[in-house]
Amino acid sequence: MRYALGVEYDGSDFRGWQNLGEGGPSVQASLEQALSSVADTPLQVVCAGRTDAGVHGQCQVVHFDTDVVRDPRAWMLGTTTRLPRSIAVRWCVPVADDFHARFSARARRYRYRLLNREVRPALDRQTLSWERRALDETLMHAAGQALIGENDFSAFRSVQCQALHARRELQSLQVSRQGEVIEVAVQGNAFLHHMVRNIVGSLILVGSGEKPVEWIAELLAGRDRTVAGPTAPPQGLVFLGPLYPDNWHLPAEVTL
């Protein structure tokens, strides 16, 4: 039997999603340990998209296979009670055997939030980035539109990125402000390592007036990571979750 889970987590205390076997706790290892305890047998999960250390997940989707019979609600609640307080299973549904959390997804969504004021955050320091320079979100939004479409995003990929190529389709990019908080929301078919944080780091330079709006288009065309902006800090980034065709019968928040 194959199940899909929707998982929410605060990434502050983890070295990332992936279980690499050493170097500190991972979200994946914590989830697999809890699931295995419920099943009373070892279980492994496959996720829709891996996140880095300090990055959060609002509705990460995973799947796992098991012969153990449990009600979906028992998987959800039983697993959550065995997890650290920074991880929760939001839902569990049985899925077809050919459903794949990663390969069945048609899009992925991220949100980056930063506090734009002179003084650093105290209360929300684990879920907000911070920029003391005054930023113009309208300039950031205008600049970001140059990235929409299928492009080579080499200028915004990490040097550690292991993807075979840098072509990705960015479907939308919206920059907005609510009071002192600027939000960058993106959706694409897939993302390169550090791609969202590198885009945000470059957009900040446009918003501060250090670079013109046209600079983002020039970066994209130049494909040179060394001349783009710095990588934005991880704590402002949330993986909102993937999106799937409706034939998989998943909850509405992850369905196209």
From Swiss-Prot:
SUPFAM superfamilies per the UniProt record, alphabetical: Pseudouridine synthase (SSF55120)
Protein keywords: Isomerase, tRNA processing
InterPro entries in alphabetical order: PsdUridine_synth_cat_dom_sf, PsdUridine_synth_TruA, PsdUridine_synth_TruA_a/b_dom, PsdUridine_synth_TruA_C, TruA/RsuA/RluB/E/F_N
TM helices/strands, residue ranges: none
Active site residues of this protein: 52 (nucleophile)
MF terms in GO: RNA binding; tRNA pseudouridine(38-40) synthase activity
One Pfam family hit: PseudoU_synth_1
UniProt keyword tRNA processing, yes or no: yes
E.C. number(s) listed in UniProt: 5.4.99.12
Residues annotated to bind substrate: 110
Family: Belongs to the tRNA pseudouridine synthase TruA family.
Protein name according to UniProt: tRNA pseudouridine synthase A
Lineage of origin: Bacteria, Pseudomonadati, Pseudomonadota, Gammaproteobacteria, Lysobacterales
Gene designation per UniProt: truA
